[in-house]
Design a protein with these regions (language model features):
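OB-fold (S1/OB) nucleic-acid-binding surfaces
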Residues: 52-76
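Amphipathic, hydrophobic secondary-structure cores in small proteins
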Residues: 67-69, 74, 82-83, 94, ...
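Short nucleic-acid-contacting surface segments enriched for D/E, G, S/T with interspersed K/R
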Residues: 38, 81-96
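Residue-level recognition of conserved beta-strand positions in structured domain cores
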Residues: 77-78, 110
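OB/S1-fold single-stranded nucleic-acid-binding modules
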Residues: 1-46, 50-56, 101, 106-117
Length: 117
């Protein structure tokens, strides 16, 4: 049995293993699955920060932080901010707020955020 698990771990893609571990991490913290959220509902989602970028919105800067839980992704938009300490790619974070739909992606404007270990 141990040999079978070792062979399975060595032959599976690293991305698949990382995705499963991230999904288990989010499930253990009772965060909503990102593939099950809908627009205009209050959610608490979390995962790993995939990207951080500054985008001009209505003439003012906005920090967009994309977070993925292995099943989907949500973009946290912090209006009027250029950076937030602790929010960098690879960190794990939870967002809480009301979702909005922008094309195919979900946004949470000025979410309450919590850095996770």
């Amino acid at each position: 049995m141990a040999f079978k698990k070792m062979v399975e771990r060595l032959t599976r893609p690293v991305e698949e293993i990382d995705r499963e571990q991230l999904t288990a991490f989010c499930d253990a913290r009772l965060l909503s699955a990102m593939d099950a959220i809908h627009a205009r509902e209050r959610v608490r989602v979390g995962g790993e920060v995939r990207s951080v970028r500054i985008v001009p919105r209505a003439g003012a800067p906005a920090l967009e932080v994309t977070v993925s839980d292995g099943r989907g992704s949500v973009v946290g938009v912090f209006l009027g901010r250029r950076k937030i300490a602790g929010l960098s790619p690879g960190r794990r974070v939870a967002f809480e707020g009301v979702t909005a739909r922008d094309g195919k992606r979900y946004l949470v404007f000025n979410p309450i955020y919590e850095l996770l270990a």
